[in-house]
Amino acid sequence: VPPWPGAKSAGKARLEIDGRVTELPVVVGTEGEHGIDIAKLRSSTGAITLDEGFVNTGSTTSAITFLDGEKGILRYRGYPIEVLAEKCDFVEVAYLLIYGKLPDAAELDGFRMALSHHTMIHEDMRSFYNGFPRDAHPMAILGSVVGALSTFYQDSLDVRDPRQVEVSVHRLLAKLPTIAAYSHKKSIGQPLIYPRNDLSYCENFLQMMFAVPCEEYHCDPDFADALDMLLIVHADHEQNCSTSTVRMVGSSDANLFASISAGISALWGPL
């Protein structure tokens, strides 16, 4: 995998305002794309930029994901999505996105164990689902319950503490399938099914979605593989609307559950 060089310098761009010339750094991204660094524009000229919709503006540098939908290119941490989809499962890809590298066997086992430790949601949260109308939109339920996690798991809300943030990340990855499956069960009037930690990430999600207490459930391996592939492909999509929303809310030092809840609301829209 090639190293991530970050934003390299590529000369200067000259901007003239009222006869005064200001030089701005030109940077080059990992795929050879050029950008103009305007961080010092206002302090140097008193001017600001106007870019409605931020069509021409990159909000940050990142070494996580590169996406070019028109060319069919998607890379996580430099790895082509085709390689990851063939060689890894979703949990491995999640580790890669979070920690910046693929895990070794011991790291992967520890990560899987950390996730399995957090699959259940607080029992009192089950009552939330009784308060939602049966036809409630799944995104409304998802955003509400994720936001409410901050009231039940107050020991991991300090965004300045890396360990607490890590615990919140583990909790979100582990609990989101449970929250989503409970939403589905509510919509069809079936009992909520507890998670099973002896199953894989995708197998567990499918059994919570489709199992019923009165009969044994067997997960189709093809369904689990297809879901795994779907989660890998959609694991990260650069600086899209929901990602930008999470970053914006998080910039206020809001806890991770609140930030992700806001991102879910942004993802809800049809655009």
Question: Which residue stretches match the model-derived regions?
Answer:
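Hydrophobic alpha-helical bundle cores within soluble ligand-binding/oligomerization subdomains
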Residues: P3-L271
